[in-house]
Design a protein with these regions (language model features):
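Non-cysteine beta-strand/loop elements that form the S-adenosyl-L-methionine
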Residues: 33-40, 123-130, 164-170
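Histidine/acidic residue-rich metal-binding segments in metalloenzymes
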Residues: 19-33, 50-97, 110-126, 146-162
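Active-site beta-loop-alpha junctions enriched in small/polar residues
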Residues: 13-14, 40-42, 73, 78-85, ...
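Glycine-rich phosphate-binding "P-loop"
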Residues: 44-55, 205-208
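A conserved active-site cap/scaffold subdomain adjacent to cofactor or substrate pockets
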Residues: 122-142
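Single conserved hydrophobic/aromatic residue that forms the stacking wall/gate
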Residues: 1-8, 12
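Short acidic/histidine-rich active-site segments
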Residues: 159-184, 188-193, 197-209
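Mid-to-C-terminal alpha-helical segments outside catalytic/metal-binding sites
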Residues: 201-248
Length: 248
């Protein structure tokens, strides 16, 4: 039976550490094991994927990566720009992760990742968690299970199977005010829609085949349909993440 991945504690933005590197150890003590260097915008650590100019990892970011490596916190570049992500791969002494994103060959968005970047990530021992958030899916809420699983099969040709997992980005029973806060925070007086639109400003509906964690059974069946065996499916649905974190 394929192994289903469990949840891990992740700091979504770097705000909890403000500009104090000593707070990284504090959030580790509270259970954090993954931390993103950015959300969509520029942070004190690196550039987000929505910035016009990607300045790469900053001096503070370099020191933060060293401290995260020391403690055993995974460097997560899901929302970061491409140059910043390459920098993080180069600077980190341990493999990094893109915990929730999809390849741009399947669905082109600012949050999607290029083949070249994903090849570099896999060669460094890093992990990609495939997102099930509708804005990251081809055809959004109407994305088919077949399309998703066919993408996974093609991605194996790019990255190899050991570096691919699931990072569902699933937000259940949350009000739209949560995603509005995530996009706007306190940095703008204008309304920032992020990956949304005027007609779809809140959380989008999940596809029918992944309404909640029970949808992993559908993914298991879909992966079998496109040719994966039980060992491969176990790897993608959990074992790859388990093996990855053992190196951190």
């Amino acid at each position: 039976t394929p192994v289903i991945s469990s949840a891990a504690s992740d700091v979504y933005k770097r705000q909890p550490i403000e500009d104090d590197i000593n707070l990284i150890e504090k959030i580790y003590e509270y259970g954090c094991r993954f931390m993103q260097l950015t959300y969509n915008n520029q942070s004190l650590l690196a550039s987000g994927c929505y910035e016009k100019n990607d300045g790469g990892v900053t001096n503070f970011g370099r020191e933060a990566i060293k401290e995260m490596n020391r403690l055993g916190i995974v460097v997560d570049m899901s929302h970061s720009g491409e140059k910043s992500t390459y920098d993080a791969i180069d600077l980190s002494q341990k493999p990094i992760a893109i915990t929730h994103a999809n390849p741009s060959f399947w669905h082109q968005t600012r949050r999607s990742k290029s083949d070249d970047l994903l090849k570099t990530l896999s060669k460094s021992g890093g992990m990609l968690g495939l997102s099930l958030y509708p804005h990251h899916l081809k055809d959004g809420t109407n994305c088919s299970l077949d399309s998703f699983c066919e993408m996974v099969a093609r991605l194996v040709d790019v990255m190899g199977i050991k570096n691919i997992g699931i990072g569902s980005d699933l937000c259940l029973n949350q009000p739209d005010s949560v995603v509005e806060w995530m996009r706007n925070g306190t940095w703008t007086k204008s309304k920032n829609l992020g990956e949304g639109s005027k007609t779809n400003q809140g959380f989008p509906d999940q596809p029918e085949w992944f309404k909640d964690a029970r949808g992993f059974n559908n993914i298991e069946n879909g992966l079998k349909k496109v040719g994966f065996d039980n060992n491969d499916i176990s790897a993608i649905l959990g074992n790859n993440w388990f093996n990855f974190y053992k190196e951190i």
